Amino acid sequence: MLLTAPSSRGSRTQSGIANVSWWALSLLLLFSPTLVSAKSAADYYVRSLPGAPEGPLLKMHAGHIEVDAQNNGNLFFWHYQNRHIANRQRTVIWLNGGPGCSSMDGALMEIGPYRLKDNHTLEYNNGSWDEFANLLFVDQPVGTGFSYVSTNSYIHELDEMSAQFITFLEKWFQLFPEYEGDDIYIAGESYAGQHIPYIAKAIQERNNKIQNDQSVRWNLRGIVIGNGWISPAQQYPSYLTFAYEEGLVTEGSSLAKDLEVYQSVCESKISASPNAINIRDCEEILQQILARTKDTNRQCYNMYDVRLRDTYPSCGMNWPTDLVDVKPYLQRPDVVQALNINPEKKSGWEECSGAVSSTFNAANSLPSVQLLPELLESGIPILLFSGDKDLICNHVGTEQLINNMKWNGGTGFETSPGVWAPRHDWTFEGEPTGIYQYARNLTYVLFYNASHMVPYDLPRQSRDMLDRFMKVDIANIGGKPADSRIDGEKLPQTSVGGHPNSTAAEQQAKEKIKETEWKAYAKSGEAALIVVIIGVTVWGFFIWRSRRRNRGYQGVYQRDVGSGSILERFHNKRSGPADVEAGDFDESELDNLHSPGPEQEHYAVGDDSDEEGPNHHPAAPPSSTKPGGAQP
């Protein structure tokens, strides 16, 4: 907006009008800070993704949300909209472990819609979990992956983590209200077995505090934990038991006798501190197994998949092989820009943060296994699954925690005193895939020939498991279902396959989502317009009064601000049928309404020059790695 004063009546009038203009603009910005700094869903829209397959880009959003203003703590998310809708909207929140390992592992190597063919080419993942669920990947705690926080402001305890995650969800649903009514499932693996139950409990507590209709109760429908670090008291002693079962160590050998000494020390430490989540003396069992079973070429077992070998002392830290492509891809400047990474995130992406892992010791937190009975009894279904070739968070420990846990009037998988729920054989497309076991709201699935990262090895089978847990039945949708059977009995249809597809239910849901989006945009747009109109009115009044005083003065404004003005076009863009997020509007039209804040700019940060913590691949032996720690 430009004001000129071609009249020769003097500079006083020009100066006065300029002052009035600045005063009006200041008033406008004072009462409408959202025009300067607040973001909308459109700011998070991913308009392109380098290396994506040909064809329409999947609808996705990504970026940072502040969860700790005092320490500049921001969590990064990457969200994908589902490809099909069976009978209702569902959202799966995915978390990787560590603590301090990025959920981009899950996004690009496990359950996300894309996998990397090489370090610059994406291809579709036929087992992606986005078939019937929206996917929300979050790098957490602060400092993990693309998330960031001020130096030395990492968090330490599980309740701190869950509080920040609730803050994240509150703000995320404000940006994307169309998803707030979804059925919500929280899923993840490894050390996320500690995070997920705490987040679930925090959601329940948040829902219980709602006293009015201004807030929406979140529909938590279940939690899913794969190869989880849930009960250290059962998981630590399982290392040696698993090593015997898999033939890594021969029972009764001299090595076995030495390891049993470490086992005895560990068990005494557990007895002294039954609620400890990290016990260094117990970690020594795993380190000794890896060190003393290496061959003459210094090849040790891969702790995440004992079918594989790795160079000592890495012992699995170089796995999965996809990491060689994932890291350079996520450090590319064009990818960083496409994912709306804040310029405040100075260092490039790393899979795992040593600083976060070493700081998050949970010394004053109870192990999450103690939260599971109450969650089950409150009606939250829980699915625990394990790949049978994982050592570090092996299925033996998971089965022991189930056998010892009491909930809903029974112990373990008891169906009645002394009677246990049977194990059912599961086949997928004619191949033995694993076993299912269920009792009193808890489901356990053991996958055959699978590692610590089950969806990495068996993507379609893992999605079939998820769809059954979410009670998806696509019989009325169409498409080719998978042949999945329990004890030979064909199960409800859960897979249609292919990218992408459309259904009547999907179209209805899209219309509902679009309606909700426009309501949210209109609400924020109307508030902004009110302030703009007030400012323009005040400015116009002073111009009119100045003209009356100084008839020789003429205000020249090069563009009409009447009914065809930018303000009107802005309103039309907010309320019309166009897709705001997809970029159908001309963003330059907004330049006259707000000043771009620093978060509106995107810079490349894809280098390693200023890392927040140690690399995921340390030079030190694995003894520096926590069980369930520094891992996917």
UniProtKB/Swiss-Prot annotation:
It catalyses: Preferential release of a C-terminal arginine or lysine residue. Glycans are attached at residues 119, 126, 441, 449, 501. Residues 492-506 have a biased composition (Polar residues). GO terms for biological process: apoptotic process; proteolysis. Keywords: Apoptosis, Carboxypeptidase, Glycoprotein, Golgi apparatus, Hydrolase, Membrane, Protease, Signal, Transmembrane, Transmembrane helix. Pfam families: Peptidase_S10. The keyword Glycoprotein applies. The chain crosses the membrane at residues 524-544. Residues 480-507, 568-632 are annotated as: Disordered. It comes from the Eukaryota. The active site is at 190, 390, 452. Its main location: Golgi. Its EC number is 3.4.16.6. It is an enzyme of class 3 (hydrolase). Residues 39-523 are lumenal. GO terms for cellular component: membrane; trans-Golgi network. Gene3D superfamilies: alpha/beta hydrolase (3.40.50.1820). Residues 1-38 form the signal peptide. It is found in: Golgi apparatus, trans-Golgi network membrane. Residues 545-632 are cytoplasmic. Belongs to the peptidase S10 family. Protease with a carboxypeptidase B-like function involved in the C-terminal processing of the lysine and arginine residues from protein precursors. Promotes cell fusion and is involved in the programmed cell death. This is Pheromone-processing carboxypeptidase kex1. The gene is kex1.
